[in-house]
Amino acid sequence: MRFKGLDLNLLVALDALMTKRSVTAAARSINLSQPAMSAAIARLRTYFGDDLFTMRGRELIPTPRAIALAPAVRDALLHIQFSIISWDMFNPVQSQRRFRIRLSDVIMLVFFERVVKRLAREAPGIGFELLPLTEDPDELLRYGDVDFVILPELFASSDHPKAKLLDDTLVCVGCPTNKQLKRQLSFENYGSMGHIAAKFGRTLKPSIENWLLLEHGLKRRIEVVVPGFSLIPPLLSGTDRIATMPLRLVEHFAKTTPLRVAELPLALPPFAQAVQWPSLHNRDQASIWMRQVLLQEALHMTTPPDSVEYRP
């Protein structure tokens, strides 16, 4: 099919090349042979009057022209895809749909286990690809690279729909042998003690607790940085270090790991975890169904207490 002299199939090839940055991988992703993909590149170059890609080792490096074209091409293809899919009837019992979801280790442990267990009973053909939050959520949603992103609402993209899932709050935790946690922490003690902190992604972006602490003037002396909250409890054992963690995750680990829990020197407001999806998925029947499942399971979650009960 052609539009103003352009074979629209070439846009599919261009999108695959921008995504995979490899001729072989791009060809495989859209079921083309490598020679056919090479021919598509030649035709794209002729039509746009630009090289579009150069080789650096085995990687394709897009030119500024290709980078400028990529968002419009992806948006056009997604509009076509979801305009067609949205009209298909979705039967979760028979579906083999695989949902691609970006989420934190906190949500994985305290919430998503419920979802997986429920669907194993009600929709056993449904699968998941659960991936860490490592990239900019706005970019992930814009390019339709995920079905859902679950993240603190403070970090949610303003360009895509969202729904609140659950509330959480931050507490201070340490080893049961940490004597400084036997009393209410002062600002001075909290700031002077060694901390373990979580940061995320390739660039180690600050997590929700770092944002809230700085927003309210609480500073820490960070001695250890880990790529997720779930790695913190084992590293507290046998040390005088402390950490600031979401209470729901602390409650999860407290079942198996000895922890001393204390209130922060300043009560911080609760924060919400939200689910987002690409705006183009709004009418996709499978996406609508999964949103309902997520929201239903979130309603069954208990509300975290307003204050922390001291644990010796």
UniProtKB/Swiss-Prot annotation:
InterPro entries to which the protein is assigned, alphabetical: LysR-type_TF, LysR_subst-bd, NodD_PBP2, Tscrpt_reg_HTH_LysR, WH-like_DNA-bd_sf, WH_DNA-bd_sf
Cystine pairings recorded for this chain: none
Residues covered by the HTH lysR-type domain: 6-63
Translocase as UniProt keyword: no
Keyword terms, alphabetized: Activator, DNA-binding, Nodulation, Plasmid, Repressor, Transcription, Transcription regulation
UniProt-listed PROSITE patterns: HTH_LYSR
DNA-binding region residue numbers: 23-42
Protein task: NodD regulates the expression of the nodABCFE genes which encode other nodulation proteins. NodD is also a negative regulator of its own expression. Binds flavonoids as inducers.
Protein's name according to its UniProt entry: Nodulation protein D 2
Organism: Bradyrhizobium japonicum
Gene: nodD2
